[in-house]
A protein has these predicted regions:
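Alpha/beta-hydrolase fold catalytic core
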Residues: 2-71, 96-97, 136-137
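Conserved alpha/beta-hydrolase catalytic His-Asp/Glu region
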Residues: 29-35, 39-42, 176-182, 195-209
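Gly/Ala-rich beta-loop-alpha elbow adjacent to hydrolase catalytic centers
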Residues: 143, 147, 151
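Short, hydrophobic alpha-helix immediately C-terminal to the catalytic nucleophile
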Residues: 87, 128, 152-156
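Conserved HGGG/HGGXW glycine-rich cap/lid loop of the alpha/beta-hydrolase fold
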Residues: 58, 64-109
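Active-site loop/oxyanion-hole signature of alpha/beta-hydrolase fold enzymes
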Residues: 50-58, 63-65, 104-142
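Flexible "cap/lid" loop of the alpha/beta hydrolase fold
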Residues: 152-157, 163-195
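Conserved catalytic-core motifs of eukaryotic protein kinase domains, centered on the activation segment
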Residues: 85-87, 110-116, 176-179
């Protein structure tokens, strides 16, 4: 006498449920809500910090450190960075120099540009407005990476103000031949990708960038 095995229970409902559960839990694991600006300001400002209204709707975070009668050095940070880049320099040099550093629009505590101008020319204009507001007529300027590109462009546009130029791995002049932007920049410009990345980009990926 032979017996037939009972049909195996269908596993598709279980598999489907696990997939749906993963799709729900995975975004929650990477969800990174914006930190309120007031919280960031309280954490990262120092007694040397001020917020300068250099343009309508734009308050630039500036630190002014060192003796007021010392030679002036203005430092410009790179892309996806902030004026904190220069804290080791400030610690070493602020006894002999008046060091002015700032967060460029879209970086650090300065926040977004109301005109969405993140071009090199726009950054040069902001640096010039900060210098004018501080009453600077002669100073050295330095920058690293993108900030180095801003620094040399500023020096080229205002040579009469510059006593020295410091470039640390600075961005160079644009190529005469048209080149495609990196894939990451292309993705960042796509509305839906940008909106998702703002909320779900893993912090570990930012820290490694």
């Amino acid at each position: 006498m032979t017996t037939t095995a009972a049909p195996k229970r269908k596993r598709w409902p279980i598999v489907t449920g696990l997939v749906v559960l993963s799709l729900v839990l995975l975004p929650m694991a990477f969800y990174t809500p914006d930190i309120p600006a007031a919280t960031l300001r309280a954490k990262y400002t120092t007694p040397a910090s001020t917020f300068m209204a250099v343009e309508p709707g734009l308050q630039v975070h500036v630190r002014d450190e060192g003796p007021r009668d010392a030679p002036v050095l203005m430092l410009i940070h790179g892309s996806n960075a902030s004026l904190q880049t220069w804290e080791p320099w400030v610690k070493r040099l602020s006894d002999s120099f008046r060091i002015i550093s700032l967060d460029l629009p879209g970086h650090g505590l300065t926040g977004a540009s109301p005109t969405r101008d993140y071009s090199s020319a726009g950054y040069v204009r902001v640096v010039n407005e900060v210098a004018a507001a501080k009453g600077l007529t002669r100073f050295a300027i330095g920058g690293n990476s993108m900030g180095g590109g801003v620094a040399w462009r500023y020096a080229a546009a205002h040579p009469e103000q510059i006593t020295g130029l410091i470039l640390v791995d600075a961005a160079g002049a644009p190529s005469k031949t048209k080149s495609e932007p990196p894939l990451a920049f292309k993705l960042a410009r796509m509305p839906y990708v940008r909106d998702v990345a703002i909320k779900f980009l893993p912090r570990s990926l930012i820290e490694k960038s």
